[in-house]
């Protein structure tokens, strides 16, 4: 498949200063990440809080400038685009933010918020704006007659639907979803995930999902990339990464899923500081299989199809855990019940979160 988005050795560090304003190091948010996303594919980037996944998502859109490396979209190096060319290219790249309460301007009505990208990119004549806004609201399960209302009049789930409608307004080829359902109630999460699945299928979208919730990821993603302290430690098809994880960190994440049937012990210790990450394999301070080589030598992400950055991936014992969805788990069971037959509300005014 043709790659729509390509990242090569992308690095992003954030400088840290002490109380006197002196340089005191840097946060290693993204360190040498290389990824590709095929046209029409859903890639999930997962990991613990602070691993760099949200920063990576913003770097993909050049909302944050990388320190080094290349980000190519549809064959173009985004770093080489002029401001005007980048502005025009943004029509094809959109983002859905995590917080539905903070991502909408409280001084703009729903119609104004959704129509803004239409005007910025001059996509439809002014006379046709209201019709396009109504069409987008219907597509995300909201009533067009509520277009004149203000964001504070909607629930969290409804606001996130509005944010999705706004992201769709410019007919993008790529959408980044930065934890798009993590702030919502579980039942509302299921509705929004179901909506996203339908949109991805019907509009043939390329979607990058940033998430810490493997239960959500399993229902949406074609491929999964696992991040730890700014680096990709495992990447491959979702069924393989979540069903037969090869990296010790991925195994621990899968084992921590609600309802997982596993003998894998939970991770011990805290995540090391991203200001001073460990040498060699950054996971060695918490890994039960770590050896001296792990402390001294950085493992490379290797493997055709299912890649892993671990010196001992081939010699590790088979993973003991199974995906929670196979064994049960109340939360995932509730999600699955929605996927089996409950479509998003055609009105969209019943969300409670």
Model-inferred region functions:
Residues 3, 16-21, 26, 235-341:
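Short catalytic/signature loops enriched in Gly
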Residues 19-24, 78-94, 120, 127, ...:
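ABC ATPase NBD coupling module
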Residues 69-77:
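Conserved ABC transporter NBD signature motif
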Residues 77, 128-145, 254:
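Conserved ABC ATPase "signature" region
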Residues 169-173:
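A short, proline-enriched helix->beta-strand linker immediately N-terminal to the Walker B motif
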Residues 176, 180-263:
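P-loop NTP-binding/switch modules centered on Walker-like glycine-rich loops
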């Amino acid at each position: 498949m043709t790659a729509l988005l390509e990242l090569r050795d992308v690095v992003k560090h954030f400088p840290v200063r002490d109380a006197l304003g002196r340089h005191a190091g840097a946060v290693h948010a993204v360190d040498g990440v290389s990824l590709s996303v095929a046209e029409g594919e859903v890639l999930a980037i997962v990991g613990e809080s602070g691993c760099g996944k949200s920063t990576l998502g913003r770097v993909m859109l050049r909302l944050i400038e990388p320190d080094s490396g290349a980000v190519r979209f549809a064959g173009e190096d985004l770093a080489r685009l002029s401001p005007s060319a980048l502005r025009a290219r943004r029509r094809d790249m959109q983002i859905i933010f995590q917080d539905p309460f903070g991502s909408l301007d409280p001084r703009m009505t729903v119609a104004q918020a959704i129509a803004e990208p239409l005007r910025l990119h001059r996509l439809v004549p002014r006379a046709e704006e209201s019709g396009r806004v109504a069409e987008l609201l219907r597509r995300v399960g909201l009533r067009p007659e509520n277009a004149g209302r203000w964001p504070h009049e909607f629930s969290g789930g409804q606001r996130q639907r509005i944010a999705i409608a706004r992201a769709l307004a410019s007919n993008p080829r790529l959408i980044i979803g930065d934890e798009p359902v993590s702030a919502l109630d579980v039942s509302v999460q299921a509705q929004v995930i179901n909506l996203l699945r339908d949109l991805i299928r019907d509009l043939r979208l390329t979607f990058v999902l940033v998430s810490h919730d493997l239960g959500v990821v399993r229902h949406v993603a074609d491929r999964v990339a696992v991040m730890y302290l700014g680096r990709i430690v495992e990447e491959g098809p979702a069924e393989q990464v979540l069903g037969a994880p090869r990296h010790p960190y991925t195994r621990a994440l899968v084992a921590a899923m609600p309802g997982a049937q596993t003998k894998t012990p939970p991770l011990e210790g805290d995540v090391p500081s991203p200001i001073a990450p460990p040498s060699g394999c950054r996971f060695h301070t918490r890994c039960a299989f770590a050896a001296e080589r792990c402390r001294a030598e950085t493992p490379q992400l290797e493997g055709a199809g299912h890649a892993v950055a671990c010196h001992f991936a081939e010699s590790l014992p088979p993973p003991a855990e199974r995906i929670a969805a196979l064994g049960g788990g109340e939360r995932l069971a509730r999600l699955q019940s929605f996927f089996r037959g409950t479509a998003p509300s055609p009105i969209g005014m019943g969300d409670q979160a």
